[in-house]
Design a protein with these regions (language model features):
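Conserved nucleotide-binding/hydrolysis micro-motifs of P-loop NTPases
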Residues: 9-12, 36-37, 57-60, 88-92, ...
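Short, solvent-exposed amphipathic alpha-helical segments in soluble enzyme
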Residues: 19-22, 70-71, 99-103, 125-130, ...
Length: 191
């Protein structure tokens, strides 16, 4: 089973929005305000297979709010796996700065959002290469959950201008299935 918890009590309508998404996906949503509330809610749902914690979208330059969010998220415990969500439309220098600012959170991977809103993702590739962080998921539209997908090398390469993916080689190598994220050996050629 899946559960969602939001700590976003800052943005107007945030709670209603996440509850709507939860309703669409058939996932129960809990709202918390403090680290203690988060700890108790996680403990209450300890039988869940997956607990997703929605956070406040904060500026990487707001040190006070980031420290507060980090303090609250510490209640998730050491087993929590944090993913940083970044928009594909963000310029490379701002993306790299955001990744640096969020490093104290010890995030494991990056979720790239709004891939459908840009034709160029060199900024994403540059920032991720500099920070040595993998992409875990991408979003490619407004539909939830249909437009969320696990990141695959093939999909990322198809988004790069000037690259084409040799589908015949991929089908030959993987039997028609797309490669899994852990297999980064997809062949791409410059066109």
């Amino acid at each position: 089973s899946v559960r969602m918890i939001t700590i976003d009590n800052y943005r107007i309508g945030a709670r209603q929005q996440i509850e709507t998404y939860g309703g669409i996906m058939g996932v129960p949503v809990s709202c918390v305000e403090t680290a203690e509330d988060l700890r108790k809610t996680i403990a209450f749902h300890s039988d869940a297979d997956l607990i997703l914690v929605d956070t406040v979208g904060k500026s990487p330059r707001d040190a006070v709010k980031l420290a507060e969010m980090q303090r609250i998220l510490a209640a998730c415990g050491p087993a929590a796996e944090l993913h940083l969500a970044l928009s594909a439309t963000t310029k490379a220098s701002d993306m790299a700065q955001a990744m640096r600012q969020f490093e104290p959170f010890d995030y494991k991977a990056v979720v790239i959002t709004k891939l459908d809103e840009t034709d160029r993702i060199g900024n994403v590739v540059s920032a991720l290469a500099e920070r040595r962080k993998p992409i875990s998921y991408i979003t490619n539209g407004q539909r939830v959950p249909q437009d969320i997908e696990r990141a695959r090398a093939e999909r990322i390469l198809m988004s790069l201008e000037g690259f084409r993916v040799d589908r015949a080689r991929i089908e030959e190598r993987y039997g028609g299935a797309s490669p899994q994220p852990e297999d980064r050996r997809v062949r791409a050629e410059r066109s």
